Amino acid sequence: MLALEVALLSDRGGRNYNEDACGHWHSDRHLCCVLADGAGGHGGGDIASKVAVQELIGRFSRQPSPDGAALGLLLRETNVALIAQRVPGTPREDMHSTAVCLVIDFIAHAAHWAHAGDSRLYWLRDGRVHRRTRDHSLVQALVDAGVMSEADMQGHPQRSELRSALGIPPEQLVVTDTDGDDTVQPGDVFLLCTDGLWEYVTDPTLEQTLAASSTPRAWLDALAATVTEAASHKTSHDNFSALVVWTRTA
């Protein structure tokens, strides 16, 4: 069995309000973590991200289905629920949200996830980035096509142009989920984060700050300090949020 340690961070950055949300739930077998980044302004985006987190955790907790395809279906159901909460003539009329959901079965040592948008999941093993999700965005498509490099994504003027997010018509929603062997080893680390964080944090920085941190909270503090320093020239830099899970042998 795995022992898990979870820590969360959500900071409004240079904005007047926070459109990010994150949360987690656990049973005697599963840990479910969700992080979301809303869009639509105050009274819209902040509501959308909270709805995404609450719906995903609520649906999973009522009927745990720990595989990638089932999590993908939960995101699609949450999309319908989010659309149903729109209110014409208010900021909620056009609210959207990214979402990334991670489930760890700590008895079977298995991890599965699904996402829509550009909020990311990083899986680190032996102190190195082992895997990460691919964004549903214009710049990710350019990287995948060989037009630009991964390094060029950070700070790109069209970085926030998404190709999928909760709140769009169901037939247009693109959700990516895991398949195959996703066995967790003791010592593996998972990071869920919004673009307000990964915009300023490179893979080497993730690895270096992790190596220098003795606890999940210390790592989050180091990542937050990195973002704050790197974004100091932007008076209105984006909200940034992260949720981390450290694993070890129980």
Where are these regions (language model features)?
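PP2C/PPM-type serine/threonine phosphatase catalytic domain
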Residues: 1-250
